[in-house]
């Protein structure tokens, strides 16, 4: 089944009727803010009505959307008034509304795209036979139909994850679609495709649709109603969407309010400006940074000791020159490797191939000894020369208030090549105040950066880069979430940066941004982009935890059922923990290494996964040998304690047993997909569904944290903080809490915990699974029998 814009959306089963939304004097106030997110909102949205929700950046649009979805999480906040979905509070309408949030990463629940799309259908007890068609149709509608259902979600770019989140909501066929800037990270073609698919689905199912979007022209002709929020207040306007085309007074009012009104050219309305690249000035067109025959990848190519094939580059054959006074826009399809190229040029990722050369001007008067490639510079040398803004701003936040974030950047800035501060204390204060004003963040100066809206976070992240005064700015989607006024302020600041001789490099799909800076367009071509596309987000492609990530395992052991492997593992573990002797442990260890071909795991790969456990086993041997009771000949007298032949034998037995218990676990979990394991535990062992799926989401979160650790290291290097372990560890903890909170919102909005559920894939026990169980039993019996025959078997409870 395929769905393309313009074709009928084929509803599967019985679609939920549209939801009727009412609100009476509804207000919401965040705990740490002086003014409410919104106040006195009165709504009456008919079932099946399609609404475009607009307003200035920070007007409370996302908060209102979360309130309607029933997933507001701030326990210390206050909500007043009445809000109803079909006459009941939103919290009691679980599964009736599908919510798409701004952050793509926190909307991915499971490790394979097919399972992730099916998650909501399962929670809503959609019959198993209907789920595959719903999933394929939804993936086709959002432009991911070419990917296999077992494709890893970790290998998706930010834009692709946004499409995946939308597919999961469309597959629900809910009565209410709540979409928060659903096309913000998409390329222009993807924007039109996704918009048309959403509208087609809403029309076919009769669902109510509310879309938050700054660029009104994207959705205006596809919706019935336009609602404009007043920042900190209620509804400023509610009117038919078509009225905006012919009501000139209304258009002028909304332009003054900072909205992106169709046919109003925001760039044309900006002050006249001639880019330095067009001026006959010696300071212009001087190369600051040059890339030659670049190949880029998230994974390092310098791993010659590995037996596995080296990672393939995301891009190759890239030649790029960044000139003084010139802006460059890196464009291309989602997943093409734009962000990877940006981070490589910024010195945060090592080039996979080719050469990056910094000019003498960029190095500075005192930087003659710096290596040519920024990747080899110290963090302090980097931050005053190259400022980088990540696709996810939160990765770079390290302080408790907005003001402190900006001050940190200005205080970390040094005269290039020296330890001398670039700005005096007075200059730092003035610089911070000016940026707060220009970025329209003055009223949020003491707010926690993590509590800002998406657009406010984006402006702050750009401000932290500007505050350090670097010559080169690397920006990833800098205009996300901006209204027309804040867009203009960003353009103004970046124009001033170009006028001063700096350069701007931006990954962007925003054509207005490119026009506003008169940017050279560096379009990634099919010849440069490798297939299949690798991850393009700040977390994707980083080192992941091998036992917690999605497994596309075609080995004999990988194709066996998780329950059978758990039973086999239980037999082996019981045999090992029942005795303390080295012989049974040695038998199990030999068996595990012998089974590597069955699991299609290379010896080097296996050794890398178990070395930490081997080191722990050696420490256990020493600790037990020192602590055990003396018996036999004394081998080493340490004064306070001794090591004898008996205590050493005990230590060896305990260490070998501990190590042997780990080996089959690594073998089993390296060939077992977490989702398959959850299916088996819930369907075959009948464990509680909430426990199993909660644990599964936690496992994915742990895998994400391994990738986020790498990303946070890059972000702190960009901020001039180097690799401070405790600071980075605290940042990781903050990220874990925030992602877990958003992941919980995603799961709730997709019907998790709504009641009885179905499973898209059945878990069953096969004859081959029986072979696995018998194999585990045979290893356990062989280990025990060999130890008894050798006379070392020592039953622990005797």
Question: Residue ranges of each PLM-predicted region?
Answer:
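Conserved beta-strand-loop-alpha-helix hinge in the C-terminal portion
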Residues: 233-258, 515-516, 525-541
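Transmembrane alpha-helix interface motif
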Residues: 540-584, 588-593, 597, 707-798
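Conserved ABC ATPase signature
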Residues: 152-156, 160, 448-452, 456
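Catalytic Walker B motif of ABC-type/P-loop ATPase nucleotide-binding domains
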Residues: 177-181, 473-477
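Conserved ABC ATPase "signature" region
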Residues: 130-147, 423-444
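ABC ATPase C-loop
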Residues: 169-170, 465-466
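Helix-to-loop junction immediately C-terminal to a conserved catalytic motif
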Residues: 69, 346
């Amino acid at each position: 089944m395929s769905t393309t814009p313009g074709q009928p959306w084929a509803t599967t089963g019985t679609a939920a009727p549209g939801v009727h939304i009412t609100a009476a004097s509804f207000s919401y106030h965040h705990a740490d803010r002086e003014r409410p997110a919104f106040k006195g909102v009165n709504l009456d949205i008919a079932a099946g009505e399609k609404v475009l929700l607009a307003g200035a950046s920070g007007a409370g649009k996302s908060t209102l959307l979360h309130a309607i979805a029933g997933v507001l999480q701030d326990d210390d906040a206050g909500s007043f008034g009445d809000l109803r979905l079909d006459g009941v509070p939103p919290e009691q309408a679980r599964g009736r509304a599908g919510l798409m949030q701004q952050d793509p990463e926190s909307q991915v629940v499971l490790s394979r795209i097919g399972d992730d799309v099916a998650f909501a259908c399962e929670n809503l007890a959609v019959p198993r036979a209907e789920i595959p068609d719903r999933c394929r149709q939804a993936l086709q509608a959002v432009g991911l139909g070419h990917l296999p259902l077992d494709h890893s979600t970790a290998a998706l770019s930010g834009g692709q994850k946004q499409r995946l989140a939308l597919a999961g909501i469309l597959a629900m066929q809910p009565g209410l679609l709540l979409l928060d800037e659903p096309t913000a990270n998409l390329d222009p073609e993807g924007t039109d495709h996704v918009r048309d698919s959403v509208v087609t689905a809403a029309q076919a199912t009769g669902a109510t649709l509310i879309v938050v979007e700054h660029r009104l022209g994207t959705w205006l002709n596809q919706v019935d109603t336009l609602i404009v929020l007043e920042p900190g207040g209620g509804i400023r306007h509610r009117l038919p969407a078509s009225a905006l085309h012919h009501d000139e007074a209304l258009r002028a009012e909304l332009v003054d309010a900072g909205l992106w009104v169709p046919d109003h050219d925001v760039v044309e309305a900006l002050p006249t400006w001639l880019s330095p690249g067009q001026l006959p000035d010696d300071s212009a067109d001087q190369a600051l940074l040059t890339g030659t025959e670049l190949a880029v990848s998230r994974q390092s190519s310098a791993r010659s000791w590995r037996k596995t094939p080296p990672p393939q580059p995301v891009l190759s054959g890239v030649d790029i020159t960044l000139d003084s006074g010139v802006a460059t826009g890196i464009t291309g399809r989602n997943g093409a490797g734009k962000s990877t190229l940006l981070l490589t040029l910024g010195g945060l990722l090592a080039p996979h191939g080719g050469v990056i050369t910094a000019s003498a001007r960029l190095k500075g008067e005192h930087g003659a000894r710096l290596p040519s490639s920024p990747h080899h510079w110290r963090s302090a040398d980097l931050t005053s020369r190259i400022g980088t803004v990540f696709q996810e701003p939160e990765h770079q936040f390290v302080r408790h208030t907005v003001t402190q974030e900006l001050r940190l950047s200005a205080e970390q800035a040094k005269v290039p090549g020296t330890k001398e501060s670039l700005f005096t204390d007075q200059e730092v204060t003035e610089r911070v105040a000016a940026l707060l004003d220009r970025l329209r963040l003055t009223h949020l100066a003491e707010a926690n950066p993590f509590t800002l809206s998406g657009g406010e976070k984006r402006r702050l992240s750009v401000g932290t880069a500007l505050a350090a005064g670097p010559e080169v700015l690397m920006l990833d989607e800098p205009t996300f979430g901006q209204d027309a006024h804040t867009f203009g302020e960003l353009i103004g600041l970046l124009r001033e940066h170009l006028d001063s001789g700096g350069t701007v490099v931006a990954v962007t799909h925003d054509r207005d941004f490119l026009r506003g800076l008169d940017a050279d367009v560096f379009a990634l071509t099919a010849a440069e982009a490798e297939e299949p596309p690798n991850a393009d987000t700040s977390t994707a492609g980083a080192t992941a935890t091998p036992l917690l990530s999605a497994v596309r395992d075609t080995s004999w052991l990988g194709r066996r059922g998780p329950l059978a492997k758990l039973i086999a593992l239980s037999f082996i573990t019981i045999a090992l923990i029942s005795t303390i002797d080295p012989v049974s442990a040695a038998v199990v260890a030999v068996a595990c290494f012998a089974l590597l071909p069955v699991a299609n795991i290379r010896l080097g790969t296996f050794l890398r996964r178990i070395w930490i456990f081997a080191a722990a086993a050696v420490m256990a041997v020493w600790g037990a040998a020192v602590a055990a009771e003396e018996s036999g000949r004394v081998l080493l007298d340490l004064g306070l304690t001794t090591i004898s032949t008996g205590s050493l034998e005990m230590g060896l037995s305990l260490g070998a047993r501990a190590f042997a218990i780990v080996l089959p676990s690594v073998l089993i979990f390296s060939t077992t997909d977490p989702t398959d394991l959850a299916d088996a535990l819930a369907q075959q062992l009948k464990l509680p569904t909430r426990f199993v799926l909660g644990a599964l989401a936690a496992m994915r979160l742990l895998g994400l944290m391994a990738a986020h650790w790498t990303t946070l290291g890059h972000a702190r290097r960009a901020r001039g903080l180097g690799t401070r372990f405790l600071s980075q560890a605290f940042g990781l903890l903050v990220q874990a809490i925030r992602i877990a909170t958003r992941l919980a919102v995603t799961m709730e909005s997709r019907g998790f915990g709504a009641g009885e559920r179905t499973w898209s894939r059945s878990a069953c026990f096969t004859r081959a699974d029986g072979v696995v169980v018998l194999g585990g039993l045979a290893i356990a019996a062989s280990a025990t029998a060999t130890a008894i025959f050798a006379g070392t078997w020592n039953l622990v409870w005797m």
